[in-house]
A protein has these predicted regions:
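Histidine-centered active-site loop/cap adjacent to the catalytic His
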Residues: 276-299
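Hydrophobic membrane-insertion alpha-helices, especially the h-region
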Residues: 6-24
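Membrane-embedded segments
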Residues: 58, 62-142
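Short hydrophobic beta-strand that contains or immediately precedes a catalytic carboxylate
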Residues: 55-59, 280
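Alpha-helical transmembrane signal-anchor/signal-peptide segments
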Residues: 26-46
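Secreted/periplasmic serine-hydrolase-like ester/acetyl group-modifying domain
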Residues: 112, 121-222
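Extended hydrophobic/aromatic segments used for targeting, binding, or gating
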Residues: 11, 230-282
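Acidic-and-aromatic substrate-binding clefts and catalytic sites of carbohydrate-active enzymes
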Residues: 87-91, 203-208, 234-243
Length: 299
């Protein structure tokens, strides 16, 4: 009787699993044409740099829009790989994809966005869109908890992939061909008159904080120089969120993982941002890069 029940359950469950997998693994033509391809390109670059000391940038789009990696590479005389794509890939996947390619002596610049809820750790629908399209093998790096959190986005991912079928729209600054050889969002960009601002909370999700501690432990054990920095943030948004940002910085210090620079060091005038509080203009990215260089030279 027990075996019979198990067989019935398997017969009932397997079709559901098959449908879920089909929905999950569908590729998205928007993602195929977008800068999301940088997830795979960055992995391939790091793989080819095995045995070479390098600089790796891990962040959301504040990293993609916020560095001139050529300046960084020329100044430090090291190859630079900017892995940054989208904050909603989630910090866990941003790190797990690449961590086995890091080697002793590498410099890893880690500057995640301020949003610090569970979604900052596990990501959202963009994670499924980008991974399914460009690097399905990365799903093997997801933990049980990560899957439990992400399954709610499968239906949304599937519907958007269907909607984007055959897309030929020019994605402009977000297009795959807007990425340079380092992984930077390199298309020239100037300040837009209206910036998207963000509301923040001043405390970090406990599970997210624990993963940040894990990153620090991993770097120490592997002999990696981890440079943990606050993201760049526009001046007007910083003024409205200053108390929350300072509270978050204090929490990081209390957890034993302090920022290596105060948040205000990477706050710039609104005119140096492109379209959001995190996306620097071309000139803004150069200024931010030079500020980071000052920190790297002190290592």
């Amino acid at each position: 009787m027990r075996r019979f029940i198990i067989k019935i359950l398997l017969i009932a469950v397997l079709p559901v699993v098959a449908v879920m997998l089909r929905m999950l693994l569908i590729t998205d033509d928007y993602s195929r044409r977008s800068h999301g391809v940088n997830v795979r390109l960055a992995y391939n670059k790091l793989d080819k740099l095995s045995g070479t000391q390098k600089i790796v940038i891990i962040a959301g789009s504040n990293g993609g829009f916020g560095f001139n990696s050529k300046i960084l590479s020329d100044s430090m005389r090291m190859p630079v790989v900017n892995t940054s794509v989208h904050a909603s890939i989630g910090v866990r996947m941003q790190f797990e994809i690449y961590k086995d390619l890091f080697e002793r002596g590498d410099i890893v610049i880690f500057c995640p966005e301020y949003y610090n809820g569970k979604g900052r750790l596990y990501g959202g629908e963009p994670l499924l869109r980008i991974v399914s399209t460009h690097m399905p093998s990365a799903y093997l790096k997801m933990s049980v908890k990560h899957w439990q959190y992400s399954l709610k986005y499968v239906w949304q991912h599937y519907l958007e992939a269907i909607e984007h079928r055959g897309m030929t729209k020019d994605l402009g600054i977000f297009a795959a061909n807007a990425i340079n050889e380092y992984g930077d969002m390199a298309m020239p960009r100037e300040h837009k008159p209206t910036l998207i601002h963000y509301g923040l909370i001043g405390s970090m999700d406990e599970e997210t904080a624990e993963y940040y501690r894990y990153i620090h432990r991993f770097a120490k054990e592997k002999g990696i120089k981890l440079v943990y920095l606050p993201p760049t943030f526009c001046e007007s948004n910083y003024r409205t969120q200053k108390a929350n940002i300072q509270m978050l910085a204090k929490q990081m210090s209390a957890l034993g993982i302090p920022y290596m620079a105060p948040p205000e060091r990477f706050v710039y005038a609104d005119s140096l941002y492109y379209d959001t509080s995190y996306h620097l203009t071309t000139h803004g990215a150069e200024l931010r890069t030079k500020a980071v260089l000052e920190i790297l030279r002190e290592l």
